[in-house]
Curated annotation (Swiss-Prot):
The TFIID basal transcription factor complex plays a major role in the initiation of RNA polymerase II (Pol II)-dependent transcription. TFIID recognizes and binds promoters with or without a TATA box via its subunit TBP, a TATA-box-binding protein, and promotes assembly of the pre-initiation complex (PIC). The TFIID complex consists of TBP and TBP-associated factors (TAFs), including TAF1, TAF2, TAF3, TAF4, TAF5, TAF6, TAF7, TAF8, TAF9, TAF10, TAF11, TAF12 and TAF13. The TFIID complex structure can be divided into 3 modules TFIID-A, TFIID-B, and TFIID-C. This is Transcription initiation factor TFIID subunit 6. Residues 663-677 have a biased composition (Polar residues). The modification Omega-N-methylarginine is found at residue 524. The modification Phosphotyrosine is found at residue 253. Belongs to the TAF6 family. The gene is TAF6. The lineage of its organism: Eukaryota, Metazoa, Chordata, Craniata, Vertebrata. The modification Phosphoserine is found at residues 264, 626, 634, 636, 653.
C-alpha cells in the first residue's frame, strides 16, 4: 500500500522536460539534469500549495467547483500578482475522452458547413488609420479652430466689460473658503460675554484686476498685417475677402485692441489729409467688426465712437467737396453711430444721450458749415422717429429759412449752395414719414407753410407721396389672389373685317407649353348697385407658332339691356408665343350678390386661347368652352395685363351691333356669325 501511495504521489510531479522547454524559450540552451529536477520539485510544490489554498477559498464559499477567482485569491495570499484574462461567465466546455491508457480533455467545436461560409457576404473593408494634426496652442495662444474649445463667448466678454471690480476678502483665496472666522462668528470671553468679530473689509487692501496684456503670436501678427493691408489697399477683391473674414472669424478677440487702434489712428491721420477713400475703407472695417457675432466691442467703443463721429461732423473730408460724394460717407457713418447706440447704450454710460447732445450742439450753432450741419442732422435722424419728433421737427422753420436764404439769395459759394440743397433733401427724406404718422389727412399746403415755413409745401408733397406709398404697400400685402385654371378650351371668334365671309376657325390650346403668369389687379372699390350693361368679357390669346409674337384683333362686345343693339369695339393685342395663365387679383370690397345682381362686377369671364400656326385648325367643328368660374370677389374694371395691351372697363365700350357674336363664342339667334364692323 505504501508503494502504491508513493507511486501515486510521484505522478503529480511535473516532468523535467518542461523545465528544459521553459529554459530554452528564455534563451538558456545548456541546463543540467539535476537543475531541471530541482526546479521541477520546487514548481510542483508551489502549484500544490496554491491549489490547496484555492480549495480552502472554495470551501469557505460553500461551493463544489473551483473557479479562477479562488486561484486569484490564493495568489494574492502569497503576495503574487494574479493572472488576468482567464475569467469567464460559464465553465469552460472541455470534454473528457480516454482511450489507450490516456486521458484527454478537448474543446468541442461545432461542425461548420463550407457552403455557408462561401455564401456569406464579405464584411465591409475597415477604414485606413489616418492621423490629423492641428494646433493645440501657438506660442501660448489657443487658435480658434473646431478641434479646440471655443473662445470666450460674447456674453462672457460683455460680463467682463460691464461688471465692476470686486475686492477679495482678507483670509480668502480666489476660489477658496475663508481661512478665519466669518462675519457672523462670535467669541466668548471668560465672563461669558460675546464679542463680534471685526468686519472683514476693515482696512483690507483692495485687489484690483490685473491689466490684460494682449500678446499676439507670429501667425496672428501676420494675419493682422494681411487684413489691414487688404482693407486699405487698392484691390477690391482682397478688401471684400478681408472684410468678410473680420465679420465672421471667431478668433479675433485678442486682436480687437489692435483693430480699434488702427481705425482710430487711421481716421485721425486721413481726416487731416482729406483722404475720402481711406475713410470709407475704415468705416467699412468698423461695420465688419460690429457684424461679427462673436465679438463684444464694449471695451473699445471709446476709440470707435470718436472715429465714426469725426467722419460725420468733420468740416471737410475730401479735397473737392463740391465734386466728391462725401455725403454718402456721412450717411453711412451716421447709421454706424445709430447701431452703436442701439447695442451699447445703457443708463450707466448714456452713450445715446451724449451723442445726441453733441449733434444738437453742432447743428444749433449759427457758424456751423453746411457739411457739418448735414452730418448732425443725419446722425440725429438715424437715431429714430422719437429723436426726429423731439429735436428736428421744432427747428424745421428756422432751418427752412436758412436754406431759402442760401438757395434764393446771391451766390456766395457753390459749396454752400450744394450743402444747403443736400440738407433740404435730407430733411424732406426723414421728416416726411414721421409727419405722415403724426398728422391726420388731408394735407393742406397752407397749413404746412404756416407751421414749417418755406419747407411747408415741399414737406406736404413728400407726405402725400409717403401716404400713397404706404397705402400701396398695404394693398400689395393684403390683396386677395385667385388663380384660375381650366382644361383645353375651344372657342370660335370673329376676326377683323375682311373681304368676303369667313368660316369660323377652331382654336386649340396646347397643353405642354411653359405657361407664364399674368396678374390682373383691381384697386377700385365696388360701385353701388345700379343698372348697367352686361359685364365685359376679356379675351387673352397666345399663338403656338414659332414666331415670337402675333397680333390679333379681338372684338369685345357689350349690349345695353332693352336697347336691342350691340356695338363691337376691336382691340389689337400683341401676344407672346407661349400660353399664359391668368391670375385674378382683387382688393375691392365685394358687394353681396343680392344687392347688385346686374352690377359691373357681378359676373366676369376671362378666356385663355392659343392660336395654332397658319393653315391649321380651320374648318373644324364649333364647340363652346366651359365657363370659367367667377372670382371670389367682384373686382371693379381691371387694368389690362401685358397681353391685353391696355385697360378695358365695364360699360366704357359702346353696345355691340345686332347680330354680332359674343366674345365667348355663343351665336345670336339671327343666324350665322357676321364679321365685326
Amino acid at each position: 500500500m505504501a508503494e502504491e501511495k508513493k507511486l501515486k504521489l510521484s505522478n503529480t510531479v511535473l516532468p523535467s522536460e518542461s523545465m528544459k522547454v521553459v529554459a530554452e524559450s528564455m534563451g538558456i540552451a545548456q541546463i543540467q539534469e539535476e537543475t531541471c529536477q530541482l526546479l521541477t520539485d520546487e514548481v510542483s510544490y508551489r502549484i500544490k500549495e496554491i491549489a490547496q489554498d484555492a480549495l480552502k477559498f472554495m470551501h469557505m464559499g460553500k461551493r463544489q467547483k473551483l473557479t479562477t477567482s479562488d486561484i486569484d485569491y490564493a495568489l494574492k495570499l502569497k503576495n503574487v500578482e494574479p493572472l488576468y484574462g482567464f475569467h469567464a461567465q460559464e465553465f469552460i466546455p472541455f470534454r473528457f475522452a480516454s482511450g489507450g491508457g490516456r486521458e484527454l480533455y478537448f474543446y468541442e467545436e461545432k461542425e461548420v458547413d463550407l457552403s455557408d461560409i462561401i455564401n456569406t457576404p464579405l464584411p465591409r473593408v475597415p477604414l485606413d488609420v489616418c492621423l490629423k494634426a492641428h494646433w493645440l496652442s501657438i506660442e501660448g495662444c489657443q487658435p480658434a479652430i473646431p478641434e479646440n474649445p471655443p473662445p470666450a463667448p460674447k456674453e462672457q466678454q460683455k460680463a467682463e466689460a460691464t461688471e465692476p471690480l470686486k475686492s477679495a476678502k482678507p483670509g480668502q483665496e480666489e476660489d477658496g473658503p475663508l481661512k478665519g472666522k466669518g462675519q457672523g462668528a462670535t467669541t466668548a470671553d471668560g465672563k461669558g460675554k460675546e464679542k463680534k468679530a471685526p468686519p472683514l473689509l476693515e482696512g483690507a487692501p483692495l485687489r484690483l484686476k490685473p491689466r490684460s496684456i494682449h500678446e499676439l503670436s507670429v501667425e496672428q501678427q501676420l494675419y493682422y498685417k494681411e487684413i489691414t493691408e487688404a482693407c486699405v489697399g487698392s484691390c477690391e477683391a482682397k478688401r471684400a475677402e478681408a472684410l468678410q473674414s473680420i465679420a465672421t472669424d471667431p478668433g479675433l478677440y485678442q486682436m480687437l485692441p489692435r483693430f480699434s487702434t488702427f481705425i482710430s489712428e487711421g481716421v485721425r491721420v486721413n481726416v487731416v489729409q482729406n483722404n475720402l477713400a481711406l475713410l470709407i475703407y475704415l468705416m467699412r472695417m468698423v461695420k465688419a467688426l460690429m457684424d461679427n457675432p462673436t465679438l463684444y466691442l464694449e471695451k473699445y467703443v471709446h476709440e470707435l465712437i470718436p472715429a465714426v463721429m469725426t467722419c460725420i461732423v468733420s468740416r471737410q473730408l475730401c479735397l473737392r467737396p463740391d465734386v466728391d460724394n462725401h455725403w454718402a460717407l456721412r450717411d453711412f457713418a451716421a447709421r454706424l453711430v445709430a447701431q452703436i447706440c442701439k447695442h451699447f447704450s445703457t443708463t450707466t454710460n448714456n452713450i445715446q444721450s451724449r451723442i445726441t447732445k453733441t449733434f444738437t450742439k453742432s447743428w444749433v450753432d449759427e457758424k456751423t458749415p453746411w457739411t457739418t450741419r448735414y452730418g448732425s442732422i443725419a446722425g440725429l435722424a438715424e437715431l429714430g422717429h422719437d429723436v426726429i419728433k423731439t429735436l428736428i421737427l421744432p427747428r424745421l422753420q428756422q432751418e427752412g429759412e436758412r436754406i431759402r436764404s442760401v438757395l434764393d439769395g446771391p451766390v456766395l459759394s457753390n459749396i454752400d449752395r450744394i450743402g444747403a440743397d443736400h440738407v433740404q433733401s435730407l430733411l424732406l427724406k426723414h421728416c416726411a414719414p414721421v409727419l405722415a404718422k403724426l398728422r391726420p389727412p388731408p394735407d393742406n399746403q397752407d397749413a404746412y407753410r404756416a407751421e414749417f415755413g418755406s419747407l411747408g409745401p415741399l414737406l406736404c408733397s413728400q407726405v402725400v407721396k409717403a401716404r400713397a406709398q404706404a397705402a400701396l404697400q398695404a394693398q400689395q400685402v393684403n390683396r386677395t389672389t385667385l388663380t384660375i385654371t381650366q382644361p383645353r378650351p375651344t372657342l370660335t371668334l370673329s376676326q377683323a373685317p375682311q373681304p368676303g365671309p369667313r368660316t369660323p376657325g377652331l382654336l386649340k390650346v396646347p397643353g405642354s407649353i411653359a405657361l407664364p403668369v399674368q396678374t390682373l389687379v383691381s384697386a377700385r372699390a365696388a360701385a353701388p348697385p345700379q343698372p348697367s350693361p352686361p359685364p365685359t368679357k376679356f379675351i387673352v390669346m397666345s399663338s403656338s407658332s414659332s414666331a415670337p409674337s402675333t397680333q390679333q384683333v379681338l372684338s369685345l362686345s357689350t349690349s345695353a339691356p332693352g336697347s336691342g343693339s350691340t356695338t363691337t369695339s376691336p382691340v389689337t393685342t400683341t401676344v407672346p408665343s407661349v400660353q399664359p395663365i391668368v391670375k385674378l387679383v382683387s382688393t375691392a370690397t365685394t358687394a353681396p350678390p343680392s344687392t347688385a345682381p346686374s352690377g359691373p362686377g357681378s359676373v366676369q369671364k376671362y378666356i385663355v386661347v392659343s392660336l395654332p400656326p397658319t393653315g391649321e385648325g380651320k374648318g373644324g367643328p364649333t364647340s363652346h368652352p366651359s365657363p370659367v368660374p367667377p372670382p371670389a370677389s367682384s373686382p371693379s374694371p381691371l387694368s389690362g395685363s401685358a397681353l391685353c395691351g391696355g385697360k378695358q372697363e365695364a360699360g366704357d365700350s359702346p353696345p355691340p351691333a345686332p347680330g354680332t357674336p359674343k366674345a365667348n363664342g355663343s351665336q345670336p339667334n339671327s343666324g350665322s356669325p357676321q364679321p365685326a364692323p
